[in-house]
């Protein structure tokens, strides 16, 4: 057991902090557009519906190029492909400062999705290549921690950058895009020099440790009936993969609907400066961090993914409804904090599921498809809320819509359990000799 702990601790120390930093940069980048919208719309003529459409177009580009990107990652290796992703997404984010109107906004948001496609599922794929199944819940929780941390940082940071309005004849939102895009460009070279492609190429594990880790991954393939398709594209037709892609939709639709509109929701509480809005926007994400520190470890300890997911969806749906129904800004913010607790921790738990039945290049293709289809929710959520806000004049209808979406996720939890886990258990029982 001490040997196993040493190996997992070493791998985690060498990989996870740097991957968390990279995803932190990516998620701050994604959050920037929500804060830029507070002023950009008036400067270049982008209304609520146009903003919702443009914010969502990122995910159309992401959807179309996710699977090809992850297959190229498997072909060229994580080191080269992650370097490419960082360079292109950083440069395109900085180019967002040049937006002149809705058309250029739409184009650059779409291109940003194309550029970033493959990063998040690429990291998930790496986790399946480095960690046995029994350790993935905790590790996934550690990695997904970068999401709420990024949102917590993004609020105050955006408030400060928006305050630079007029410096060097640039608007504050232009400074915001330049500032959040630059770190990705600067991290490209260190990533190329540091990130290993596979277990065999690292020098920080002994031969004995490498062999143990590879043996454990092989054991997982047998124990969890993992599939390694002869052609990785066949994973795209696997019914289990398609079901999980559908199951991921409620998570992404809710989380991006909330993330990209939260500054506007906070502003409707009663105004306030950009810095005040930024700091208030960070509060729900503190609870997202708490959820990620508690829930994934609990799922590993109890070996119960679906019970936890059911609880999170049910609680999140109730809290989302209350955030639109309540009139007190304090209570609304408290309800949104509960929503963040549920959404971020459910994301970490969800991503332990595909690796239970996919491995190798099939995992790269399958995870990419799940993420790309699921991330269509990132298009529907912001766009749908934008339309509802423009029609009703407030955010309540959009929050009720997200509450219904989370109830749909609760229903899907039972369907996924019945189709994947219970069916597998019955098969195992039938195969046991009498």
Swiss-Prot record:
InterPro entries hit by this protein: MFS, MFS_dom, MFS_trans_sf
Pfam families: MFS_1 (PF07690)
A single Gene Ontology CC term: plasma membrane
Membrane topology, as annotated: Multi-pass membrane protein
Any one GO molecular function term: transmembrane transporter activity
Membrane-spanning parts: 15-35, 45-65, 85-105, 110-130, 142-162, 175-195, 241-261, 275-295, 306-326, 333-353, 367-387, 396-416
Signal sequence segment: none
Principal localisation: membrane
Location of the protein in the cell: Cell inner membrane
GO biological process, one term: response to antibiotic
Top-rank taxon: Bacteria
UniProt keywords, alphabetically: Antibiotic resistance, Cell inner membrane, Cell membrane, Membrane, Transmembrane, Transmembrane helix, Transport
Gene inactivation effect: Inactivation of the gene causes a significant reduction in the surface-associated motility and virulence. Mutant has 2- to 4-fold higher susceptibility to novobiocin and trimethoprim, and 8- to 32-fold higher susceptibility to the quinolone-type antibiotics nalidixic acid, levofloxacin and ciprofloxacin. Mutation does not affect susceptibility to beta-lactams, aminoglycosides, macrolides and polymyxins.
Function: Efflux pump that mediates resistance to quinolone-type antibiotics.
PANTHER family xref list: PERMEASE-RELATED (PTHR43791), TRANSPORTER, PUTATIVE (AFU_ORTHOLOGUE AFUA_6G08340)-RELATED (PTHR43791:SF36)
Family: Belongs to the major facilitator superfamily.
Identification of the protein by name: Quinolone resistance transporter
Organism: Acinetobacter baumannii
Lineage: Bacteria, Pseudomonadati, Pseudomonadota, Gammaproteobacteria, Moraxellales
């Amino acid at each position: 057991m001490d040997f196993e702990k040493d190996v997992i601790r070493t791998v985690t120390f060498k990989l996870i902090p740097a991957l968390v930093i990279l995803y932190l940069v990516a998620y701050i980048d994604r959050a920037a557009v929500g804060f830029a919208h507070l002023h950009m719309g008036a400067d270049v003529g982008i209304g609520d519906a146009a903003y919702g459409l443009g914010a969502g177009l990122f995910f159309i580009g992401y959807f179309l190029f996710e699977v090809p990107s992850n297959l190229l990652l498997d072909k060229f290796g994580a080191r080269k492909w992650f370097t490419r992703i960082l360079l292109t997404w950083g440069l395109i984010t900085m180019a967002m400062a040049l937006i002149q109107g809705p058309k250029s906004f739409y184009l650059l948001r779409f291109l940003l999705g194309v550029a970033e496609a493959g990063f998040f599922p690429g990291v998930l794929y790496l986790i399946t290549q480095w960690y046995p199944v029994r350790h993935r819940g905790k590790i996934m929780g550690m990695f997904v921690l970068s999401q709420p941390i990024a949102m917590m940082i993004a609020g105050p940071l955006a408030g400060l950058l928006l305050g630079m309005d007029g410096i060097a004849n640039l608007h504050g939102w232009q400074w915001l895009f330049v500032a959040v895009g630059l770190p990705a460009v600067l991290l490209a070279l260190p990533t190329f020099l540091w990130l290993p492609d596979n277990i065999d190429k690292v020098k920080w594990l002994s031969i004995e440790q490498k062999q143990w880790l590879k043996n454990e991954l092989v054991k997982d393939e047998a124990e969890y009936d993992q599939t390694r398709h002869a052609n990785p594209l066949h994973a795209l037709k696997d019914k289990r993969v398609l079901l999980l892609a559908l199951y991921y939709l409620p998570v992404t639709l809710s989380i991006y609907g909330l993330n990209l509109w939260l500054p506007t929701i906070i502003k409707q509480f009663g105004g306030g400066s950009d810095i005040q809005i930024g700091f208030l926007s960070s509060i729900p994400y503190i609870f997202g961090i708490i959820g990620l520190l508690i829930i994934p470890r609990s799922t590993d300890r109890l070996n119960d993914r679906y019970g936890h997911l059911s609880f999170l969806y049910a609680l999140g749906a109730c809290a989302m409804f209350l955030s639109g129904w309540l009139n007190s800004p304090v209570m609304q913010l408290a309800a949104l904090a509960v929503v963040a607790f549920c959404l971020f921790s459910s994301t970490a738990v969800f991503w332990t599921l595909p690796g239970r039945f996919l491995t190798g290049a099939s995992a790269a293709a399958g995870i990419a498809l799940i993420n790309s289809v699921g991330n269509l929710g990132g298009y529907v959520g912001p766009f749908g809320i934008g339309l509802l806000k423009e029609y009703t004049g407030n955010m309540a209808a959009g929050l009720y819509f997200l509450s219904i979406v989370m109830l749909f996720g609760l229903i899907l939890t039972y369907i996924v359990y019945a189709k994947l886990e219970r069916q597998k258990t019955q098969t195992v029982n039938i195969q046991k000799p009498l």
